[in-house]
Amino acid sequence: MTDRYAVMGNPIEHSKSPEIHRMFAEQTGQAIAYERMRVPLEGFEPAVRAFFASGGKGLNITVPFKEQAWVLVDRRAPRAERAGAVNTLLAEAGRLVGDNTDGTGLVRDLTVNHGAALQGRRVLVIGAGGAVRGVLPALLPEAPGEVVIANRTVARAEALVELFADQGRLSAVGFDRLQGPFDVVINGTSAGLAGELPPLPDDLLAPGATCYDMVYGDQPTPFVRWARAHGAAMAVDGLGMLVEQAAESFLIWRGVRPESAPVIAALRPE
C-alpha cells in the first residue's frame, strides 16, 4: 500500500518538494506518493480536511498558508508553537498535529553540510517576517553569542526580540544603525530574489564570515553575490535548507532520516 503525501500552497507549480521526496523514498525504500496541490486562497481548511479524510498521511505547507496551518491544528510541536507557523502536518489518532521544520533545515544545512559554527558567534539576521520567526526557535538553541535582527521597520524586529528574549542575547536595529563585524549573516528576506538588497555597510563582515541566503535560485542570489564581493569566506543559498527541512518532515512521517547530500547535489544546477 502506497501512502499519500502532498505539498499545499498557492502558487505551487515550481515546488521541488515532490522531486525531493521521490528521491528520499527511493533511497530509503519507503512506499510513498507525493504530489503538488494548488489550493484556492480561501479554501485551505477544507482542502486539508478532505486530504486527511481521504486517507492522506501527511502534508507540507508552503506560502501563503503556514500561519493558517498553525491555527488549524489540534496540537503543535514546541518549535512550531514558537515559530507561529506550521509547514508539516500529520494525523495522530484522529487529531491534526503541526510541526515546523524550517529552522532545523537552516541549522542542519549551516552546521552539518557547510561546517559553520554558531556557538558564541555574533549573528546578524536580515528581516523580521514569518520566515525569520520560523527559524529562530532552532537557531537560538545553538547558543550564538549575540543575535542582531535588522529590519527596515524596526518595530517588527523589536517584536521578535521580545518574543524570543528568554532564548538568548538578542537586539533589534534599523539598517541605518547597523554595526559590524558579524561572524554569520543570514538573509531572511525575499527581497533578495528581486535584486533589491537592503543597504548593508561595507564593513559588515568579520574575517572568515559565513553568509547564508534563505532563498535560492538557479543563479547566485543578489545577497550571495554581495557576500562574495565583500569578502565572505563562505556564501551559500538556501537550496540545502529546502532539502534539510524536507528530510526533517520525512523523518517525522516515516521514522527514518534520509541522506540529504545526494539530493542537494542532484538539484543543484551544473
Curated annotation (Swiss-Prot):
The keyword NADP applies. It catalyses: shikimate + NADP(+) = 3-dehydroshikimate + NADPH + H(+). Its EC number is 1.1.1.25. One of its GO terms (cellular component) is cytosol. One of its GO terms (molecular function) is shikimate 3-dehydrogenase (NADP+) activity. The active site is at residue 66. Keywords: Amino-acid biosynthesis, Aromatic amino acid biosynthesis, NADP, Oxidoreductase. One of its GO terms (biological process) is aromatic amino acid family biosynthetic process. It holds the Pfam family Shikimate_dh_N. It is an enzyme of class 1 (oxidoreductase). InterPro entries: Aminoacid_DH-like_N_sf, NAD(P)-bd_dom_sf, SDH_C, Shikimate_DH, Shikimate_DH-bd_N, Shikimate_DH_fam, Shikm_DH/Glu-tRNA_Rdtase. Pathway: Metabolic intermediate biosynthesis; chorismate biosynthesis; chorismate from D-erythrose 4-phosphate and phosphoenolpyruvate: step 4/7. NADP(+) binds at residues 127-131, 151-156, 214, 238. Signal peptide: none annotated. Shikimate binds at residues 15-17, 62, 87, 102, 216. Homodimer. Involved in the biosynthesis of the chorismate, which leads to the biosynthesis of aromatic amino acids. Catalyzes the reversible NADPH linked reduction of 3-dehydroshikimate (DHSA) to yield shikimate (SA). Belongs to the shikimate dehydrogenase family. This is Shikimate dehydrogenase (NADP(+)). It comes from Alkalilimnicola ehrlichii (strain ATCC BAA-1101 / DSM 17681 / MLHE-1).
